[in-house]
């Protein structure tokens, strides 16, 4: 899978999910905290730049292997 660059639109820490806006302008992608790579607290900040892959989830496309850049 190719890595896609994007920016965090919003992320709700208490609920553990949010959305990423891909840099290519395509539709926002759902992200769950379990898809965030790294140690410690798995959260994202609004406006943070990330790289990710897209996988089909239960409710449509979802980001996986999310890393901050």
Swiss-Prot record:
CDD domains: CSP_CDS (cd04458)
Cellular component GO terms held in the UniProt record: cytosol
Domain CSD: 6-66
Subcellular location, record wording: Cytoplasm
GO terms of molecular function: DNA binding
Keyword Ion transport assigned: no
Predominant location: cytoplasm
Keyword Nucleus included in the entry's annotation: no
PROSITE patterns (UniProt xref): CSD_1, CSD_2
Domain of life: Bacteria
Record-linked NCBIfam families: PRK09507.1, PRK10943.1
UniProt name for this protein: Cold shock-like protein CspC
Organism of this sequence: Shigella flexneri
């Amino acid at each position: 899978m190719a890595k896609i660059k994007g920016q965090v639109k919003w992320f709700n820490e208490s609920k553990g999910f949010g959305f990423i806006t891909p840099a290519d302008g395509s539709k926002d992608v759902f992200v769950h905290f379990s898809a965030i790579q790294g140690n410690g607290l798995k959260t994202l900040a609004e406006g943070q730049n990330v790289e990710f892959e897209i996988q089909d989830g239960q409710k449509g496309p979802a980001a996986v292997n999310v890393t901050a850049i």
